Amino acid sequence: MSKSLIVALDFPGKKEVEQFLQHFEGEELFVKVGMELFYKEGPAIITYLKEKGHKIFLDLKLHDIPNTVKSAMRSLASLDVDMVNVHAAGGSSMMKAALEGLEEGKQEGKERPICIAVTQLTSTSEVMMKKEIGIEKTLEEAVAHYAKLTKESGLDGVVCSTLEVPKLREVCGDEFVTVTPGIRLASDDVNDQVRVATPKRARELGSSYIVVGRSITKAENPLEAYQTVKQQWEGVTV
């Protein structure tokens, strides 16, 4: 199965995760563990998923003073997760501190986790950004600014909308990692996300990784839905 397709385990606890993963016995997935699940189950959920052979994107979006983020990342790296993130709005010093913590905390003989930054949440519209957050740039300009700052700080890439990927390729180059949530099958509701795209569109726009949640986790047949997303993402004709 594709390692560039990340399945969001947006469940309230381990019981629901176990029920979901029964559909994928023997398969190694790349999964995302977010705040809800991690805060409920703690590091034990990471250990459980690793024992099952899955890769893990631990999506906690750290945003604090540099020393606190450094210490937190040192702890997270010791869990042997594969990807972590911070908010780019925390600034360059904070992002550099995150990398230092990951290097110090990584397990012996292992590479440090991929570290990416959130530019703007996919629930953020330009009106919201200007009116409520107080950023006067256009949404595209703000995302590009944060992405450039992220690259200059030494991080591997950003979380962004698929619609922003082409511009970020221009600004940050082809090797810069773009992780894009807000992915839905064409038949699904968009729910609370504003900037969404299909797996096919994400591929066409050049995303490095896509994160898919409800289209798979809420499907009547999760494995079948996963395969459909995977085929669209990889451009496989069936």
UniProtKB/Swiss-Prot annotation:
Pfam families: OMPdecase
Annotated GO CC locations: cytosol
Active site: K61
Domain of life (superkingdom): Bacteria
Assigned keywords, A-Z: Decarboxylase, Lyase, Pyrimidine biosynthesis
Family: Belongs to the OMP decarboxylase family. Type 1 subfamily.
Protein name: Orotidine 5'-phosphate decarboxylase
Species of provenance: Bacillus cytotoxicus (strain DSM 22905 / CIP 110041 / 391-98 / NVH 391-98)
This protein's encoding gene: pyrF
